[in-house]
Structure formats: C-alpha cells, structure tokens
C-alpha cells in the first residue's frame, strides 16, 4: 500500500491533508499513489480529484514549446505532487490511464488551455473534466466568478481564512520546498471544498 509519508498540513477547519512529493524516474512505480488518490476520491463520496499541471516553456525560433513538468492531484485527505522526467518514461503509462479514468471527474481552475496542451503535446486525454469556475458562475449566477483564480474563487465561495496561503505566496521566491508543498496542499483542498459546496 502506498504511504503518503510526506509532510502533513492542518487546514483552516482543523482537518489534515497528508502529502507526498515524488521525483518520477524510469523505475518509479507511481500506480500505488494514484490508486490511493482514486480510492480517497471514491470514499469521500463525490468522486472528484482536483488537479493542476505545471509547464516548462521553451522558445524555439518564433514559437513556444510547452512540456508538462509536474502534476498535482488533491482529494479531501491527500495531495500528490509528481515531478515528471524529461523525456517521459514508459512508467508514465499509469498516469495516462489515470487521466483517462471514467470513474472520477478531474476538477481544475482555468483548465481549458491545459486540457488542449495535454492532448496536443503529450497525447493525454482526460475523459471527464470540470472547470470549477464555470460551475461556480452558473451556480451563483455571477458570471465574473468563472474568471477567478484559485485563491479568489475559494474566498468568494467559502469565505475561509486565507492568511497562511497569502503568507506563503507573498514570499514565493524565498519559500522553502516545504512551504510550496503546503501551498499546493492548501490550494487543492480549497478547490475540493469549493466543488463539495457547489454540489450541495
């Protein structure tokens, strides 16, 4: 069984999010961690996994090349951060299969361009995805909500104390890897809770 043995972080409602950050190499088996994320999404009832992707951008002559360099998956209790190799290895087939799952919905903020880049640049197809901003705008009857980022959207819907996230982000360049992991966990947890709130 996969162990999320990274740092754990307390959220503003006193719940706990356990993390795991992995530098994926050709011999790394990520499938147990993906299974744990999937299992937690099912046990928490809404079958959603919050995801975020991070890109390396390289300019070649007059155009930019985008390469997926890391991905984050969050559920109610876990945050998994995968730093991906360049070039991709065969063991990332598990990641492709995970994204193609029809049993869960991958939820994200401002993900339309990411979905297109994943497909165009890496052949990754997400079968079931949800742009949380669009759902929030429709549910609240406030079109502008669709264009908010993670922090602003979560604040608008949940009204949670954002001081810890703000503190980390205000000093991002000096932030430790542990602080950055905490920010990733907080953001994933916030969007999970926004989705949960909008479904009620």
Curated annotation (Swiss-Prot):
Pfam families: DNA_pol_A_exo1. Belongs to the RICE family. It is found in: Cytoplasm. InterPro entries: 3'-5'_exonuclease_dom, 3-5_Exonuclease_domain, RNaseH-like_sf, RNaseH_sf. Disulfide bonds: none annotated. Keywords: Cytoplasm, Hydrolase, Nuclease, RNA-mediated gene silencing. This is Protein RISC-INTERACTING CLEARING 3'-5' EXORIBONUCLEASE 1. Gene3D superfamilies: Ribonuclease H-like superfamily/Ribonuclease H (3.30.420.10). It is an enzyme of class 3 (hydrolase). It comes from Arabidopsis thaliana (Mouse-ear cress). Changing residue 47 to E: Impaired oligomerization. Ubiquitously expressed throughout development in germinating seeds, cotyledons, leaves and roots of young seedlings and adult plants, stems and inflorescence. GO terms for cellular component: cytoplasm; cytosol; plant-type vacuole.
């Amino acid at each position: 069984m996969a162990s999320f043995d990274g740092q754990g972080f307390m959220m503003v409602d006193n719940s706990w999010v356990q993390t795991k950050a992995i530098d994926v190499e050709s011999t790394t088996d990520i499938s147990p961690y993906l299974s744990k994320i999937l299992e937690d999404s099912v046990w928490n009832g809404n079958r959603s996994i919050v995801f975020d992707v991070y890109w390396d951008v390289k300019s070649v002559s007059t155009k930019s090349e985008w390469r997926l360099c890391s991905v984050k998956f969050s559920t109610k209790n876990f945050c998994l951060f995968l730093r991906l190799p360049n070039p991709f290895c065969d063991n990332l087939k598990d990641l492709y299969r995970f994204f193609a799952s029809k049993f869960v919905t991958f939820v994200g903020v401002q993900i339309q361009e990411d979905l297109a880049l994943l497909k165009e640049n890496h052949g990754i197809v997400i079968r079931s995805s949800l742009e949380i901003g669009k759902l929030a705008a429709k549910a609240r009857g406030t079109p502008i909500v669709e264009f908010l980022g993670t922090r602003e959207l979560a604040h608008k819907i949940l009204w949670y104390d954002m001081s810890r996230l703000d503190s980390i982000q205000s000093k991002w360049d000096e932030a430790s890897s542990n602080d950055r992991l905490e920010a990733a966990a907080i953001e994933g947890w916030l969007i999970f809770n926004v989705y949960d709130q909008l479904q009620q």
